[in-house]
Amino acid sequence: SKLSKRKNPTSINYYRHMGYMPEAVVNYLGRMGWSMPDESEKFGLQDMLDQFDLRAVHLGGPVFDTEKLDWLNGRWIRENLDEQAFANRVAEWAINRDNLARMIPLIKERVEKFSDIAPLLGFMFSGMPKLDTSHFEHKKLDNETVRRILQYSSWRLDGLRHWSRDGLYEELNQLAQGMELKLKDFLSPLFVAVAGSSSAPPLFDAMAILGPDMVRARIRSALEASGGVSKKQLKAWDKDYRLLSAARTEHPE
């Protein structure tokens, strides 16, 4: 697929959170529309600068292949990191002290021993939760409503300029009211989308810490896992969402 927000997250922060090595990402982007004279697939930035020739740039539209990026990142990990370097990179990626300090208040009252932390915060360090339609079953929400919640939330969060706990609460609470749903029911699919489970630390705090790139990507992934949206549905839902947004503008609280 082409590199688009609909199918591939375009923010570099997403790929950092997913655990890609910066060297591998630069390597992969360098290969999009250009190749080394010897056709080697793995190369560093300095190698690329030394060998770059504008005449060798391909005119066709580049295709972003995440499986290829995974393969290339794996090569960088295996071929360029010894055990100590590997440990250092993992620690740098996973144990961000600032983020850890923000997470502690969310789980401290629920922890009786340190080994309890992993199940509570595992979703903060993982990629896309592996979900299917069964994860979104809810006694008060049918599948279409679940998918509308995810799609409308995706649209609303795409337009959110200031990413904060209070801002997220305000926007999603207003959206729940516009859809005439209780906030608890409305948030259920979002818990699953963001954390992979309906049992997780406070959602808005977790979303604020995860950041916009990862949260938006997980919601889009969850929408596909819950059944996706047809073109006909998307057109109808877009019209309904615009009406909800217009009503909010006309009658702000």
Give each language-model segment a name:
Residues 1-77, 188, 192-194, 198, ...:
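Alpha-helical recognition segments enriched in aromatics with Gly/Pro capping
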Residues 17, 74-78, 95, 112, ...:
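Amphipathic alpha-helical interaction elements
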Residues 29, 73, 104-111, 124, ...:
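Short alpha-helical scaffolding segments that buttress acidic/His motifs in well-ordered protein cores
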Residues 34-38, 57-58, 78-82, 99, ...:
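Intrinsically disordered or highly flexible coil/loop and linker segments, enriched in small
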Residues 82-179, 183, 241:
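Small-residue-rich helix-loop
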Residues 166-236:
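Charged substrate- and nucleic-acid-binding regions of tRNA-handling and nucleotidyl-transfer enzymes
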Residues 245-253:
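Mixed-charge, low-complexity intrinsically disordered regions
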